[in-house]
UniProtKB/Swiss-Prot annotation:
This protein's name: UPF0391 membrane protein CKO_03415
Topology relative to the membrane: Multi-pass membrane protein
Lineage: Bacteria, Pseudomonadati, Pseudomonadota, Gammaproteobacteria, Enterobacterales
Keyword Transmembrane: yes
Places the protein is found: Cell membrane
Family: Belongs to the UPF0391 family.
Organism: Citrobacter koseri (strain ATCC BAA-895 / CDC 4225-83 / SGSC4696)
């Protein structure tokens, strides 16, 4: 998940540097969504994974 977030962030930065506003905005939005989903899944696995024997 974080890898995809980083990839979208890099695409957004390159597109912003080249002046493609629409593409940069789309890639930045996708990066934010992937990042938030990754954090949520991490927190769920962190709390659900702690089961006492």
């Amino acid at each position: 998940m974080f890898r995809w977030g980083i990839i979208f962030l890099v695409i957004a930065l390159i597109a912003a540097a080249l002046g493609f506003g629409g593409l940069a905005g789309t890639a930045a939005s996708a990066a934010k969504i992937v990042f938030v989903v990754g954090i949520v899944l991490f927190l769920i696995s962190l709390f659900m994974g702690r089961k006492r024997p």
